[in-house]
Amino acid sequence: MTIRRAAVEEASVLTTIALEAKRYWGYPEHWIKHWESDLTVSPEFVRDNHVYVAEADGEVRGFYALCVGEEKEHELDRKAELEHLWVSPDFIGTGIGKELFLDAMERAAALDVRDVELSADPNAAGFYTRMGATQIGEVDSPIDGTERKLPRLKITP
């Protein structure tokens, strides 16, 4: 498996992976439709951010997107958001997510990022805490009259 920069032409493939991975958790289809815009990866997003794919046998099996904030006067204040980290359902549990996460942290460190933050799907929060992230709060994410809270996590690369 190799991890490489995503090509803008792969945006639709990345969107498909994100949607399929979200479905993996058994959410109702109308919830998936509600989240579709948040899970859509545009060519412009790929161009403007640090988007990397895990590829094996010519197939993209997962990806992440690291959105790095502006450089601050004091470099130690630079932060990033792990906007996406998705693995195709056929490959969940194979270590691809871990490899993508570790690659994202290495790239964040190389970019002088002090902290990486993310809002995790509740089903993925355990993965991030096993990778060293700590919960710093919660984000309201109500849907369909259901109160949902997403764990807000932080990790120092």
Residue ranges and their predicted role:
Residues 1-9, 157:
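Conserved N-terminal entry element of GNAT/NAT acetyltransferase domains
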Residues 8-11, 15-90, 101-103, 107, ...:
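Acetyl-CoA-dependent GNAT
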Residues 32, 122-123, 142:
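Conserved beta-strand edge residues that scaffold enzyme active sites
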Residues 95:
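Conserved G/P- and acidic residue-centered "switch" motifs that form tight phosphate/ATP-binding loops
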Residues 108-121:
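Conserved GNAT acetyl-CoA-binding A-motif
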Residues 117-119, 134-152:
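Conserved catalytic-core motifs of GNAT/GCN5-like acyltransferases
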Residues 128:
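Conserved active-site tyrosine of GNAT-family acetyltransferases
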